[in-house]
């Protein structure tokens, strides 16, 4: 059935464009495109990408925003995000990955997810590449403008301050001008605001009992059949005001024959003002068991604390690019990009504790798939501020900054997508990166007894549970006022200088690559064969105390490394029929270690009496992961609005990186005198891991086989299944066990959307499923492995188009109120944390003219 431009609009146009891009791509890919209003119907880039086959998202600390991209089940550190062909710097403290909640979806005209690789692509991508193409003035004939405005209501409102409106405003303008409309300009701006709260119900840890006796967890201990008791119950309430601001501009020139030029710049900022309040009750001694799931503690201790985290992530860049045609089929492309990614967090922490007491005893009863029920012996004692003494208060400032300079020169001869016959691509790529991290901490300890009753509590009330006490709230303003009025009541902690210096590091990297790639475009076949030669020079500088027990004296250590990689790649496409396409691909890619793993140390714990040292140190000599990738994809396109595909992939990853803890005996370590037992936690390269998987995708935007109004239904669905064979982790007793999975990598993930379009009305109901994800692997016993439990969330969108320009939208986010849950236990049956972010509802207007 032929559909004209009037009939195809909105979400149908977006899906058609994405299908077309996948069909014409030289590699295995998927994607998402803007619709005719110039909008991807999501608020952040991460939310848009999680609808793409094989993509799942790591949520921002579990609190409701899609932040990092997991592709084909590979955690974010295995993947790369490009904007107009350039890998921009991270806005995190110790990871290389980009925070996608910083980038608005409105920036993108098209996002392609490349799952196989060519020699001209960034090689730091074992899982894949998300390539974002920004808007161009030449996407439209003449002037184009769009405005999008939404007002939102979050179900979970802030407790400590009055809630303010949530929503989004974005605008885009583009036009061509000058002689023959050879010049173009694009301007866009976006503001997003989320005013909400979250509740985290935390248990933290459990103890295991055999015959009424608490067991020390060791790697060989079999906990099957043992009684289980929670050690701590800790509600945490978060008040968050998140804001995203962005500005983007592009000036273009295209003479239509010889030369294209583009000068673009972007500034993106994401801020989070977070107020956290928590109170916990903790066991003292062992549980008195009633049966396997309930009992009581005769004594307990307690703590109440207040934290404020003022976080700002900023990404800014400027880019100049040009394409110069040498002949009818050949051109040279040149690109220069300067970028900076930064992260700053200002922390204020106030802590008050209640000493062990029988009046803080409590009973417990484990629930199935729910939090344990906690029954306090004396709720009045638990809630009395006179029983809590100040432990300390501190301020901490973290600053991380990454500067990059990228320069690319690429030559292409008869190798563009519309070419026929043999072609050639070759190029040189260079990148300079400078990463800096600095922490400054000031902690003050009370010189005497300071109770919370003396300081005063917060007047707000937070009562998360009907069957448990309201939180006893610390008021940071009253603590600060008390400290200012009583400066002699506090002394500086002796650890301030050490904690401020030991975590600092700086990394300088210079990488370059030269590649050559042959191409073939036949009537029914397409192929690429290439080789990329890449080098990486790195210098890492960090501080260590000298001697290791010192809190005031430090020495700088420096480490240099130089590595080279030969990275072959090949892709073959065969149009078996006009509607059926087969793809084969093989490649080698790398995965660079995180900044924290190669540069960041932590303060050592030195016991000069017991002659022991516990430390966590960086490993600047970590080698990058190396992956050999094989892919097979079969794609069927019955028409331009439907698709059915299956893709198989296999990856062998050498030099896998895991964090291991080892204990050795050292004589006179780090300037100390004597023979010490030294326990060291460090990221190291270990054995190989293999991952194989399969992806299924089915799209049909119109069920033409159904009668009447039912024919306007459509659907999209994709499923990714992963089968990893992981490297081994060293346990606390020196034994080895296979990791139960790849970190932050679900073995199963799926998306499904039900579509309906009839006349001016359109609707979309979307479901996103993410399977069990390993978050950390324990070295004492596997029961302490931490996971995100499987979760399914639902979103709904309704739209009414009044005319070609105006559209009214209604959206529901997380309409089933799915709660992210972190679990532990032999069968992941124990709730460790559950995060309630609530539902959100948006009412908006889109207007294009």
Regions found by a protein language model. Give the residues of each.
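Gram-negative outer-membrane beta-barrel transporters
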Residues: 650-652, 657, 662-664, 669-778, ...
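N-terminal periplasmic "start-of-domain" segments of outer-membrane beta-barrel proteins
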Residues: 7-43, 68, 76, 86, ...
């Amino acid at each position: 059935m032929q559909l004209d431009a009037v009939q195809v609009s909105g979400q149908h146009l977006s899906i058609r464009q994405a299908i077309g891009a996948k069909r014409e791509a030289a590699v295995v890919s998927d994607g998402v495109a803007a619709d005719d209003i110039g909008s991807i119907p999501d608020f952040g880039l991460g939310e848009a990408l999680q609808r793409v086959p094989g993509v799942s998202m790591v949520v921002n600390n579990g609190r409701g925003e899609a932040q990092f991209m997991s592709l084909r089940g590979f955690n974010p550190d295995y993947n790369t995000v490009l904007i107009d062909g350039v890998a921009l710097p991270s806005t995190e403290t110790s990871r290389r990955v980009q925070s996608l909640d910083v980038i608005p979806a409105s920036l993108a005209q098209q996002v392609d997810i490349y799952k196989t690789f060519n020699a001209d692509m960034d090689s730091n991508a074992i899982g894949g590449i998300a390539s974002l193409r920004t808007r161009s003035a030449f996407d439209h004939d003449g002037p184009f403008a769009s405005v999008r405005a939404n007002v939102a209501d979050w179900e979970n409102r802030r407790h400590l301050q009055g809630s303010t409106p949530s929503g989004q405003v974005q605008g885009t303008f583009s036009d061509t001008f000058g002689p023959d409309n050879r010049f173009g300009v694009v301007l866009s701006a976006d503001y997003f605001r989320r005013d909400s709260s979250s509740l985290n119900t935390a248990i933290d840890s459990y103890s295991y009992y055999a015959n009424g006796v608490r067991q020390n967890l060791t790697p060989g201990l079999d906990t099957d059949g043992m009684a289980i008791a929670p050690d701590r119950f800790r509600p945490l309430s978060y008040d968050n005001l998140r804001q995203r601001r962005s500005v983007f501009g592009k000036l273009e020139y295209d003479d239509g024959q010889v030369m294209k030029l583009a000068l673009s710049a972007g500034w993106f900022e994401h801020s989070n003002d977070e107020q956290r309040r928590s109170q916990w009750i903790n066991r003292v001694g062992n549980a008195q068991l009633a049966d396997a799931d309930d009992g009581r503690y005769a004594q307990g201790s307690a703590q109440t604390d207040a934290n404020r985290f003022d976080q700002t992530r900023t990404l800014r860049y400027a880019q100049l690019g040009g394409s110069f045609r040498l002949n009818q089929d050949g051109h040279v492309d040149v690109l220069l990009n300067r970028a900076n990614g930064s992260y700053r967090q200002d922390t204020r922490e106030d802590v008050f504790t209640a000493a062990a007491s029988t009046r803080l005893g409590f009973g417990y009863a484990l629930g199935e798939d729910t939090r344990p029920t906690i029954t306090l012996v004396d709720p009045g004692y638990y809630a009395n501020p006179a029983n809590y003494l100040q432990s300390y208060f501190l301020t901490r400032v973290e600053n991380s900054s990454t500067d990059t300079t990228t320069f690319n020169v690429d030559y292409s001869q008869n190798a563009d997508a519309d070419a026929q016959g043999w072609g050639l691509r070759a190029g040189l790529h260079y990148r300079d990166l400078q990463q800096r991290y600095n922490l400054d901490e000031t902690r003050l300890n009370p010189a005497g007894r300071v109770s919370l009753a003396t300081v005063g509590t917060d007047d707000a009330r937070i009562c998360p549970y009907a069957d448990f006490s309201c939180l006893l709230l610390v008021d940071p303003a009253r603590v600060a006022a008390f400290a200012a009025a009583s400066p002699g009541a506090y002394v500086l902690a002796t650890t301030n200088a050490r904690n401020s210096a030991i975590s600092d590091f700086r990394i300088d990297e210079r990488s370059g690559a030269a590649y050559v790639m042959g191409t073939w475009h036949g009537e029914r076949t397409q192929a690429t064969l290439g080789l990329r030669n890449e080098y990486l020079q790195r210098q890492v500088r960090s501080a260590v105390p000298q001697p290791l027990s010192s809190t005031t004296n430090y020495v700088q250590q420096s480490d240099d490394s130089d590595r080279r990689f030969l990275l072959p790649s090949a892709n073959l496409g065969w149009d078996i029929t006009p509607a059926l396409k087969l793809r084969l691909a093989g490649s080698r890619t790398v995965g660079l270690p995180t900044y924290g793993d190669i540069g960041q140390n932590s303060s050592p714990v030195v016991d000069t009496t017991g002659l022991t040292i516990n430390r966590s140190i960086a490993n600047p000599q970590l080698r990058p992961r190396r992956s050999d990738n094989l892919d097979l994809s079969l794609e069927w396109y019955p028409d331009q609005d439907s698709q059915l595909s299956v893709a198989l992939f296999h990856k062998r990853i050498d030099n896998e990186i895991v964090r291991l803890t080892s204990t050795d005996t050292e004589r006179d370590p780090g300037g100390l005198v004597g023979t010490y037992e030294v326990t060291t936690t460090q990221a190291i390269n270990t054995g190989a891991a293999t991952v194989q998987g399969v992806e299924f995708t089915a799209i049909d935007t119109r069920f033409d086989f159904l009668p009447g109004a039912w024919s306007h239904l459509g659907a999209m669905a994709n499923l990714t299944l992963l089968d990893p064979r992981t490297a081994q982790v060293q346990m606390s007793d020196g034994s080895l066990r296979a990791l139960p999975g790849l970190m932050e990598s679900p073995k199963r993930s799926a998306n499904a959307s039900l579509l309906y379009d009839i006349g001016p009305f359109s609707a979309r109901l979307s479901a996103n499923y993410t399977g069990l994800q390993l978050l950390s692997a324990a070295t004492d016993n596997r029961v302490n492995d931490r996971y995100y439990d499987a979760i399914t969330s639902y979103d709904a969108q309704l739209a009414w188009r009044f005319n070609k320009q105006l559209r009214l939208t209604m959206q529901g986010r997380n309409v089933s109120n799915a709660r992210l849950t972190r679990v532990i236990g032999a069968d992941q049956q124990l709730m460790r944390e559950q995060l309630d972010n609530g539902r959100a509802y948006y009412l908006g207007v889109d207007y294009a003219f």
